Swiss-Prot record:
It holds the Pfam family CSN8_PSD8_EIF3K. Keywords: Cytoplasm, Initiation factor, Protein biosynthesis. This is Eukaryotic translation initiation factor 3 subunit K. It comes from Aspergillus clavatus (strain ATCC 1007 / CBS 513.65 / DSM 816 / NCTC 3887 / NRRL 1 / QM 1276 / 107). GO terms for molecular function: ribosome binding; RNA binding; translation initiation factor activity.
Length: 249
């Protein structure tokens, strides 16, 4: 059974009290939530429900918006893909931060924040569409990307682990060269250490097609034959035929 969306095992008691009370909509709690986002970045935790509450406060009180905190929330959401977290957070950003602002949008608002949101949205699209090599290529293509994820401790490692989880669902065996690109681990030694120590997979160097990585079977990647059959009794045909005669009469 999945964990409820509004639950987080690592959530502090004072944050839980705010989320379950009227103070959730109190602008004075904005700083408390912002400090909690910073804590999540340091502790490698993610509390989507609390982060959405902060973004909702920003939506109600645009003047309180902290661009760095908002982008940190989006960057943290990337580390829990595939999930709706990033899309939900993106949808709650104030109108002037959207890539396509309305005609009456405040022109004084900095465009740097909009650019940052667009870049993070691009990374999210690449991850959600399983374009892992392109994700790393894009991440490494611009120093701004590095700045956007700099506050998130272990960002690259967290993303690699999520990629590994998705790979483990789809493959039983995969070429090491492909994984080097998907994990952005250009050293074979680094790749072998990651897949064996972190993922618990096996490296086979004696394969006919070069080094391959073998993934243990699980309920997602195991091939199963499934036979479906339905029993249709004679009495069912009898009812259909009888109904046809009744309508004709």
């Amino acid at each position: 059974m999945g964990v409820a969306f509004d639950k987080c095992d690592t959530r502090p008691a004072h944050i839980d009290a705010i989320l379950n009370g009227l103070d959730r909509y109190n602008p004075e709690t904005t700083t408390v939530f912002q400090d909690y986002v910073a804590q999540q970045c340091e502790d490698r935790t993610f509390d989507c429900y609390a982060n959405l509450a902060l973004l909702k406060l920003y939506q109600f009180n645009p003047h309180l918006l902290q661009a760095e905190t908002a982008t940190n929330i989006l960057a943290k959401a990337l580390t829990v893909f595939p999930s709706p977290a990033f899309s939900l957070c993106l949808a709650l950003l104030p109108a002037h931060t959207q890539p396509f602002p309305t005609a009456d949008a405040d022109a004084s608002q900095t465009s740097d924040f909009v650019e940052s949101v667009q870049k993070l949205a691009r990374l999210s699209t690449l991850l959600e569409s399983a374009q892992y090599a392109q994700f790393w290529s894009t991440l490494n293509s611009d120093d701004l990307y590095a700045d956007l994820v700099a506050d998130v401790a272990g960002f690259e490692e967290l993303v690699r682990i999520r990629i590994a989880v998705e790979v483990g669902k789809a493959f039983r065996e995969i070429n090491a060269e492909v994984l080097e690109q998907w994990f952005d681990l250009r050293s074979r030694e680094a790749l072998e250490k990651f897949v064996t120590e972190v993922c618990g997979w096996e490296v086979d160097k004696a394969g006919p097609n070069g080094t391959v990585v073998k993934v243990p079977s699980n309920k997602e990647n195991e091939v199963r034959s499934e036979v479906k059959s339905e029993h249709v009794g004679v009495e069912m045909f009898g009812r259909v035929i009888r109904r046809g005669f009744e309508q004709a009469a």
